[in-house]
Amino acid sequence: SKDLAALVERFKEAGMPISYEHLGEPLPNDANLQLTIYRIAQEALTNVLRYAPTTKRITVRLARRVGCAELWVINAAAPGSPSMHKGLIGMRERAAVYSGSVQAGPVDGNWQVYAILRWQEDTLEELKWQLPV
C-alpha cells in the first residue's frame, strides 16, 4: 500500500537502512484493513528503532494473496538487543479483527515480526486477478 511505502520512506529519511517490497496485487480498497497493516508495521518499526537502533538492515515485505495479506518486518538482530515484545499485544489485537495473528521472534539470525490478516474473497470481481487468462 502507498501508505506503507510512505512509512518506510520516513524511516529511510531518518537514516534507517530499510527497504520495502510489495508482492502481488494491491490490497483491497478497505481503509480499516490498510490502516491495520500500517499500524502493525509502524509498531514493529518503532520497536526496531527503540531496541535495535544499530541494526544494519530492515526489510518490510507485504504480500497480497487470495483472502489474506502477509506482512513481515525483519531486522538484522543487533548484538545484545533485548527482545522486542513491547507492543506485541496491540499488534495481535489489531490482527485479530481480521481473523489474523502476529508472531515475533528470532529467525535465521534476524528478528522477525510476521502478521497475517484474512478477509472473505468470494466474488468473481474480487478473484478475477487470480484467474488464469
For each predicted feature, which ranges?
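Glycine-rich/acidic phosphate-handling loop/turn and adjacent ATP-lid/helix
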Residues: 71-89
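Short beta-to-alpha transition helix within the HATPase_c
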Residues: 1-16
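Conserved short strand/loop->alpha-helix "switch" segment adjacent to the catalytic nucleotide/phosphoryl-transfer site
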Residues: 20-41
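Flexible, glycine-/charge-rich segments associated with ATP-binding catalytic modules
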Residues: 94-133
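Conserved phosphate/oxyanion-binding catalytic-loop motifs
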Residues: 44, 91
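Short beta-strand/loop element within the Bergerat-fold HATPase_c
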Residues: 57-67, 72-75
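Short helix-loop "hinge" at the ATP-lid/N-box region of the Bergerat-fold HATPase_c
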Residues: 48-49
